[in-house]
UniProtKB/Swiss-Prot annotation:
Similarity field: Belongs to the NrdR family.
Alphabetized UniProt keyword annotations: ATP-binding, DNA-binding, Metal-binding, Nucleotide-binding, Repressor, Transcription, Transcription regulation, Zinc, Zinc-finger
Free-text function comment from the UniProt entry: Negatively regulates transcription of bacterial ribonucleotide reductase nrd genes and operons by binding to NrdR-boxes.
Cofactors, names only: Zn(2+)
The organism's taxonomic lineage, starting at the top: Bacteria, Pseudomonadati, Pseudomonadota, Betaproteobacteria, Burkholderiales
Molecular function GO terms recorded: ATP binding; DNA binding; zinc ion binding
Keyword Membrane: no
Any one Gene Ontology BP term: negative regulation of DNA-templated transcription
This protein's name: Transcriptional repressor NrdR
HAMAP family tied to this protein: NrdR
Residue intervals of every unnamed zinc finger in the record: 3-34
Gene behind this protein: nrdR
Cofactor remark: Binds 1 zinc ion.
Length: 160
């Protein structure tokens, strides 16, 4: 591998470690010319499916867009970056495991909603309100009822 500091073609692997998830190898390398050290990461490159939008247009899968959607819904919520990274990884794993060459944007939206429901209920309602285009307060209430299940009955929403 070429040295990023001096451009020399010969480097030596000093140390290799497998990540905790087992899907990445971290390698410490030393340049045989300038003696500087640097880190590289090796992982399998899999092609994500093409996203088919509601209007029928197609675009490449964009992990930054997925992460941005999650971050927006989770803004000012007590969810760590590691938890967001885990959600992105689970969504991507699901998409890759499907083996599909194309995936509907609606399917990705449903995967995001499932992850948000697990991570943070408020973020779930935020995302659902935009994703499902809520038009009135009744739709918010219905989404909350569905999420809460039988614990939130109609009697608890009435003013006493």
């Amino acid at each position: 591998m070429r040295c990023p500091f001096c451009g020399h073609a010969d480097t030596q692997v000093v140390d290799s470690r497998v990540s905790e998830e087992g899907d990445t190898i971290r390698r410490r390398r030393r340049c045989l010319s300038c003696d500087k050290r640097f880190t590289t990461y090796e992982r399998v490159e899999l092609a994500m499916p093409t996203v088919v939008k509601r209007d029928g247009s197609r675009s490449e899968y964009d992990a930054a867009k997925l992460r941005g959607s999650l971050a927006l819904a989770l803004r000012k919520r007590p969810v760590s970056t590691e938890e967001v990274d885990g959600a992105v990884a689970r969504i991507e794993d699901t998409l890759l495991a499907s083996g599909a060459r194309e995936v509907a944007s609606e399917h990705i939206g449903e995967l995001v909603m499932n992850e948000l429901k697990r991570l943070d209920k408020v973020a779930y309602v935020r995302f659902a309100s935009v994703y499902k285009s809520f038009e009135d307060i009744g739709e918010f209430v219905e989404a909350i009822r569905e999420m809460q299940g039988p614990r939130l009955g109609a009697g608890k929403l009435r003013k006493e």
